């Protein structure tokens, strides 16, 4: 019988049961004592609930009284009766609808609403009511699932723990003097050969008049004779033989006839509370393991993070795949990808083939098995793969290369098999493996792979799945990496990755397109096209991720300044923040150091201004940025694919301009030129030892490894000495020319330095006022020309608008829009 039906039955019988609770109905204890018949004036309620024949409260009270063997259980039963009879408590265990709330139950709404004139407010109210009821229903079901076991467990533990609270422990001497000598002992039950339970005769007056049954001892704490016995006292015995001997001696001393000796019975009882507590740690441990296994299967698991779709301990060999299809939300399309038109065209061929395979099959063409996206970090490899998933319209399975590696042996190959099996089941499909270099590294040689056995097994399984004996068509594999040089050659061969699509950093046109995409999402004071070209000119060498960071930094700076729109000043501050680091205006710098930095940066500006092949200066500042830079000069370099010897020489001179200015104008040098000297040394060594510009070294090239693990030089010591002497000579020539240039324009260098000390930041317009126009004109427009072109167009438009506004006549007659004071 369910708890709901039990509660309803108890509520129906609550009133009669409460009246019968005061009547003389008593059950014996566990020792088997018989009931005393009630007086004729008090009818005894039946065990099945009296007249109704149902399960009444008397049965529950009687059962609890018999089970606990104590009168206190009657009071506890009365308390439980009032709780169970509460309608709100019964409603927790009922699946039926509440009274007068049937219309609010979603399950009861089977008929469609009549008419179509319902307004939106009613529908919203109904939906909110349904959501509220769904939450209440879910909470109620969860409460039903947990409350019943907890209630039963609490009732059992409370009854078991307090079952012996009404029994009093006495000594054998007290038993002999107060109970055995007056002849009040009815019988003795020895439990488990250790405890002697004494059943004494209770007072008949306590049952007939409804008094407290705990008062079984009459005046002077002596019970009456010839009454039904109850278990009230107990004492511990050392051994059965000793107890029987002492009991027999005591009764013989009292002159009791052997036929009237107190009967002694031996029982083996189970203390349920002790048994439960003994098995409680084991049950708790088993339950904990069960809950952990359920949680691992639902999300928090081995081999995967928390969340939906995690791998359990029994599913650790399955790949955790992010699957997308045509119904997925938050898709990325090819129109959201810019700056890599050639790579996008190659990827779009895969999409076109999957959508229209007959067009290619009629020509005898086969779709490539895979394509490897290669490029520097932040160029949009993963974004291009997301666009492929959004445009293809076929299932797209994405996984990271590190997801194949696990602490268990054999998990990697198993996940590769599971991944391709899932892809073949929904073919045609696309698999994208991001950062494939985690499992695609070149295998070890000579059997000395060591700890890479698991990775090599995973790679072997990937090779077999892509182009092996049992390979099936319809699955295209895309992969992304920025380390193609370390991949295994077997992975790069045609038949597996047929194409290598290189995604380089965007040029100025690509950056313009990328800026247009990100600027559409910002609140600007002008159109996105107003900023895109000049920002593209200001950010040479920036990848797509860097451009996104610039836009985000500009928005943060505008929000920090409590601005409602983003302006060009915010974008320039964002670019300075990314290039130079965090601005530190509060950094403590002495006046002498600040003056040295000002002359150093002024030397860079003047040297670059009067050198033909030097990059044009955009801005110079002495505001400290980053961790070490006390000032910097920002240039707008041209993205030249080829560099001449003269260009490199002028760039070397410009880099040495700060050191030359310190020597010429201040008269002493500082450590501020350390970074400049490092750049000059690297640039000059490249000219001599790599580019073949030196006549003494000849047409030889010794490129250095980028990783710095080159143990031996690929040339002799004599050649190394020639290279060192040549580099030293070239740097000396460049520095000599720079000193002459700074000496020639000493006054201008000092004037710019004083302006820097006053303003801290100078732009090209300030330099033009001091130095005049640059004496060199480029034959083709440079990045700086493109940057200035936007401002020139803005000034022209303002001038045109000013020309269109009406002007006052010469005779003093006011125009239409002029206000004349009176």
Swiss-Prot record:
<feature type="binding site">
    <location>
        <position position="600"/>
    </location>
    <ligand>
        <name>Zn(2+)</name>
    </ligand>
</feature>
<dbReference type="GO" id="GO:0034982">
    <property type="term" value="P:mitochondrial protein processing"/>
</dbReference>
<dbReference type="InterPro" id="IPR027417">
    <property type="entry name" value="P-loop_NTPase"/>
</dbReference>
<protein>
    <recommendedName>
        <fullName>ATP-dependent zinc metalloprotease FTSH 8, mitochondrial</fullName>
        <ecNumber>3.4.24.-</ecNumber>
    </recommendedName>
</protein>
<keyword id="KW-0862">Zinc</keyword>
<feature type="transit peptide" description="Mitochondrion">
    <location>
        <begin position="1"/>
        <end position="93"/>
    </location>
</feature>
<feature type="binding site">
    <location>
        <position position="604"/>
    </location>
    <ligand>
        <name>Zn(2+)</name>
    </ligand>
</feature>
<keyword id="KW-0378">Hydrolase</keyword>
<feature type="active site">
    <location>
        <position position="601"/>
    </location>
</feature>
<dbReference type="GO" id="GO:0008270">
    <property type="term" value="F:zinc ion binding"/>
</dbReference>
<dbReference type="InterPro" id="IPR037219">
    <property type="entry name" value="Peptidase_M41-like"/>
</dbReference>
<dbReference type="GO" id="GO:0005745">
    <property type="term" value="C:m-AAA complex"/>
</dbReference>
<comment type="similarity">
    <text>In the C-terminal section; belongs to the peptidase M41 family.</text>
</comment>
<dbReference type="Pfam" id="PF01434">
    <property type="entry name" value="Peptidase_M41"/>
</dbReference>
<dbReference type="GO" id="GO:0016887">
    <property type="term" value="F:ATP hydrolysis activity"/>
</dbReference>
<keyword id="KW-0809">Transit peptide</keyword>
<dbReference type="InterPro" id="IPR000642">
    <property type="entry name" value="Peptidase_M41"/>
</dbReference>
<feature type="region of interest" description="Disordered">
    <location>
        <begin position="103"/>
        <end position="131"/>
    </location>
</feature>
<feature type="compositionally biased region" description="Low complexity">
    <location>
        <begin position="1"/>
        <end position="25"/>
    </location>
</feature>
<dbReference type="InterPro" id="IPR003593">
    <property type="entry name" value="AAA+_ATPase"/>
</dbReference>
<feature type="binding site">
    <location>
        <begin position="375"/>
        <end position="382"/>
    </location>
    <ligand>
        <name>ATP</name>
    </ligand>
</feature>
<dbReference type="Pfam" id="PF00004">
    <property type="entry name" value="AAA"/>
</dbReference>
<dbReference type="InterPro" id="IPR011546">
    <property type="entry name" value="Pept_M41_FtsH_extracell"/>
</dbReference>
<feature type="binding site">
    <location>
        <position position="676"/>
    </location>
    <ligand>
        <name>Zn(2+)</name>
    </ligand>
</feature>
<keyword id="KW-0482">Metalloprotease</keyword>
<dbReference type="Pfam" id="PF06480">
    <property type="entry name" value="FtsH_ext"/>
</dbReference>
<dbReference type="Pfam" id="PF17862">
    <property type="entry name" value="AAA_lid_3"/>
</dbReference>
<keyword id="KW-0547">Nucleotide-binding</keyword>
<keyword id="KW-0496">Mitochondrion</keyword>
<dbReference type="GO" id="GO:0005524">
    <property type="term" value="F:ATP binding"/>
</dbReference>
<feature type="compositionally biased region" description="Basic and acidic residues">
    <location>
        <begin position="108"/>
        <end position="127"/>
    </location>
</feature>
<dbReference type="InterPro" id="IPR003959">
    <property type="entry name" value="ATPase_AAA_core"/>
</dbReference>
<dbReference type="GO" id="GO:0004176">
    <property type="term" value="F:ATP-dependent peptidase activity"/>
</dbReference>
<comment type="similarity">
    <text>In the N-terminal section; belongs to the AAA ATPase family.</text>
</comment>
<dbReference type="InterPro" id="IPR005936">
    <property type="entry name" value="FtsH"/>
</dbReference>
<keyword id="KW-0067">ATP-binding</keyword>
<keyword id="KW-0479">Metal-binding</keyword>
<feature type="region of interest" description="Disordered">
    <location>
        <begin position="1"/>
        <end position="50"/>
    </location>
</feature>
<comment type="function">
    <text>Probable ATP-dependent zinc metallopeptidase.</text>
</comment>
<dbReference type="InterPro" id="IPR041569">
    <property type="entry name" value="AAA_lid_3"/>
</dbReference>
<dbReference type="GO" id="GO:0004222">
    <property type="term" value="F:metalloendopeptidase activity"/>
</dbReference>
<feature type="region of interest" description="Disordered">
    <location>
        <begin position="202"/>
        <end position="221"/>
    </location>
</feature>
């Amino acid at each position: 019988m369910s708890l709901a039906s039990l509660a309803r039955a108890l509520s129906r019988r609550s009133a009669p049961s409460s009246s019968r609770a005061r009547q003389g109905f008593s059950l014996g204890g566990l020792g088997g004592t018989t009931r005393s018949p009630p007086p004729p004036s008090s009818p005894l309620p039946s065990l099945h609930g009296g007249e109704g024949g149902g399960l009444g409260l008397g049965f529950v009270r009687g059962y609890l009284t018999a089970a606990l063997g104590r009168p206190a259980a009657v009071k506890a039963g009365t308390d439980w009766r009032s709780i169970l009879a509460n309608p709100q408590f019964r409603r927790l265990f009922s699946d039926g609808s509440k009274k007068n709330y049937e219309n609010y139950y979603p399950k009861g709404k089977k008929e469609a609403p009549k008419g179509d004139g319902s307004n939106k407010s009613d529908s919203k109210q109904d939906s909110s009511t349904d959501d509220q009821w769904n939450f209440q229903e879910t909470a109620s079901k969860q409460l039903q699932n947990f409350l019943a076991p907890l209630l039963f467990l609490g009732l059992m533990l409370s009854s078991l723990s307090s079952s012996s609270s009404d029994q009093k422990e006495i000594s054998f001497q007290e038993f002999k003097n107060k109970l055995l000598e007056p002849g009040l002992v009815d019988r003795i039950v020895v439990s488990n050969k250790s405890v002697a339970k004494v059943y004494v005769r209770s007072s008949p007056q306590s049952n007939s008049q409804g008094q407290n049954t705990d008062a079984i001892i009459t005046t002077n704490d002596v019970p009456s004779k010839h009454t039904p016995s109850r278990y009230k006292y107990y004492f511990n015995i050392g051994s059965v033989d000793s107890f029987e001997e002492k009991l027999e001696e005591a009764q013989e001393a009292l002159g009791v006839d052997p036929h009237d000796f107190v009967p002694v019975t031996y029982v083996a009882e189970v203390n349920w509370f002790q048994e439960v507590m003994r098995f409680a740690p084991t049950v708790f441990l088993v339950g904990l393991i069960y809950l952990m296994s359920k949680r691992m299967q639902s999300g928090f698991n081995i081999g995967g993070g928390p969340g939906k779709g995690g791998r359990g301990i029994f599913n650790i060999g399955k790949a955790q795949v992010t699957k997308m299809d045509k119904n997925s939300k938050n898709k990325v399309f090819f129109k959201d990808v810019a700056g890599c038109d050639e790579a996008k065209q190659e990827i779009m061929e895969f999409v076109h083939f999957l959508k229209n395979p007959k067009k290619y099959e009629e020509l005898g063409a086969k779709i490539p098995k895979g394509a490897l996206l290669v490029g520097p970090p932040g160029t949009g490899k993963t974004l291009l793969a997301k666009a492929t998933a959004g445009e293809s319209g076929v299932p797209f399975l994405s996984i990271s290369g590190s997801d194949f590696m696990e602490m268990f042996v054999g998990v990697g190959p198993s996940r590769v098999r599971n991944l391709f099996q899932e892809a073949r089941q929904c073919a045609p499909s696309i698999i994208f493996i991001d950062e494939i270099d985690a499992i695609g590294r070149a295998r070890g040689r000579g059997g000395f792979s060591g700890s890479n056995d698991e990775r090599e097994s995973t790679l072997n399984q990937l090779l077999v799945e892509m182009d092996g004996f049992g390979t099936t068509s319809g699955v295209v594999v895309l992969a992304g990496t920025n380390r193609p040089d370390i991949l295994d050659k077997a992975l790069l061969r045609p038949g597996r990755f047929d194409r290598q699509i290189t995604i380089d950093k965007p040029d100025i046109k690509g950056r313009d397109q990328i800026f247009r995409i990100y600027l559409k999402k910002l609140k600007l004071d002008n159109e996105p096209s107003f900023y895109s070209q000049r920002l593209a000119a200001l950010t040479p060498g920036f990848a797509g991720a860097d451009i996104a960071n610039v836009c985000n930094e500009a928005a943060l700076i505008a929000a920090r300044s409590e601005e409602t729109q983003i302006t060009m000043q915010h974008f320039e501050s964002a670019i300075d923040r990314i290039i130079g680091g965090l601005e530190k205006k509060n950094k403590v710098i002495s006046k002498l150091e600040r003056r040295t930095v000002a002359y150093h940066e002024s030397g860079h500006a003047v040297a670059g201004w009067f050198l033909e092949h030097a990059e044009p200066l955009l801005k110079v500042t002495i505001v400290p940025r980053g961790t070490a830079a006390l000032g910097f000069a920002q240039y707008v370099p041209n993205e030249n694919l080829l560099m001449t010897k003269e260009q490199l020489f002028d760039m070397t001179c410009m880099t040495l301009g700060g050191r030359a200015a310190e020597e010429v104008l201040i008269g002493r040098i500082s450590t501020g030129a350390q970074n400049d000297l490092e750049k000059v040394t690297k640039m000059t060594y490249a000219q001599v030892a790599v580019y073949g510009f030196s006549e003494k070294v000849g047409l030889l090239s010794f490129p250095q490894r980028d990783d710095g693990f080159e143990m031996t030089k690929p040339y002799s010591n004599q050649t190394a000495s020639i290279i060192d002497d040549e580099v030293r000579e070239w740097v000396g020539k460049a520095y000599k020319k720079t000193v002459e240039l700074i000496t020639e324009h000493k006054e201008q260098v000092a004037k710019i330095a004083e302006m820097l000390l006053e303003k801290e930041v100078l732009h090209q317009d300030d330099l033009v006022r001091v130095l005049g126009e640059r004496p060199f004109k480029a034959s083709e427009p440079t990045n700086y020309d493109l940057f200035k072109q936007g401002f020139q167009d803005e000034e022209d438009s303002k001038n045109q608008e000013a020309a269109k506004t009406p002007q006052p006549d010469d005779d003093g007659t006011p125009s239409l829009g002029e206000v004349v004071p009176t």
